[in-house]
Amino acid sequence: MNTEVIAIIPARFASSRFPGKPLADMLGKSMIQRVHERIAGVVPRAVVATDDERIRQAVEDFGGEVVMTSPECSSGTERCREAFDKVGRGEKIVLNLQGDEPFIQKEQIDLLISAFDKPETDIATLAEVFSSDASFERLNNPNSPKIVLDHGGYALYFSRSVIPYLRGVQPDSWCRRHTYYKHIGIYAFRPTVLRKITSLPQSTAEQAESLEQLRWLEYGYRIRVLQTQQSTIGIDTPEDMDKAIAYLRSQGME
């Protein structure tokens, strides 16, 4: 394990689409426990950052490391920064891993960390290619932000809308005619950059799309995007949870 890496898992109880999501039961374990167990098997430290006593107690009950953060944090990255300032031990890379990704793969975490083999990398994230047979309905889902990349693998823009627009092509054919990238919302930062980007005021594009990474782009920070071959099952709604539990059962992970 790379001892210069710490993973922080922001977890909020309040959610407009799925209140109490971190503590939702997944066949005998809470979602936050399943997330923590996956990550703790890959990196030397995995710390849950929360502002809710119920989550703190649940994490302590299963033996995980947890830190309380301010309820005033406006984003997961702000919560990640506050947690690192409180419990960091001089690690060189800070991972911000979502508390609603219980199926995150070891290969994805390793890939994210590998971005920092290049000294010019300050921020890294992952993307997955939409399959060529993906429907326009799936592509157009605003809960699956899309990314446009430059030739060097850095993000030009993130959007909940479909970008780019294929002029003169029927929407159901877009994924066959163009390579679209789905953002997987996990990040890695150098600590100095994490502190800088969380000190910036919100940007106009960030406010419009409700995507905090647009703030970093608007202020001139570069985000390196690595392509993963593994799919994940993010959980945004109770319906997503039903699918996740069905997947657990199908894999004999009860």
From Swiss-Prot:
InterPro entries: Cytidylyl_trans, KdsB, Nucleotide-diphossugar_trans. One of its GO terms (biological process) is CMP-keto-3-deoxy-D-manno-octulosonic acid biosynthetic process. Pathway: Nucleotide-sugar biosynthesis; CMP-3-deoxy-D-manno-octulosonate biosynthesis; CMP-3-deoxy-D-manno-octulosonate from 3-deoxy-D-manno-octulosonate and CTP: step 1/1; Bacterial outer membrane biogenesis; lipopolysaccharide biosynthesis. Its EC number is 2.7.7.38. It is found in: Cytoplasm. Its main location: cytoplasm. Keywords: Cytoplasm, Lipopolysaccharide biosynthesis, Nucleotidyltransferase, Transferase. One of its GO terms (cellular component) is cytosol. It catalyses: 3-deoxy-alpha-D-manno-oct-2-ulosonate + CTP = CMP-3-deoxy-beta-D-manno-octulosonate + diphosphate. GO terms for molecular function: 3-deoxy-manno-octulosonate cytidylyltransferase activity. Activates KDO (a required 8-carbon sugar) for incorporation into bacterial lipopolysaccharide in Gram-negative bacteria. Belongs to the KdsB family. This is 3-deoxy-manno-octulosonate cytidylyltransferase.
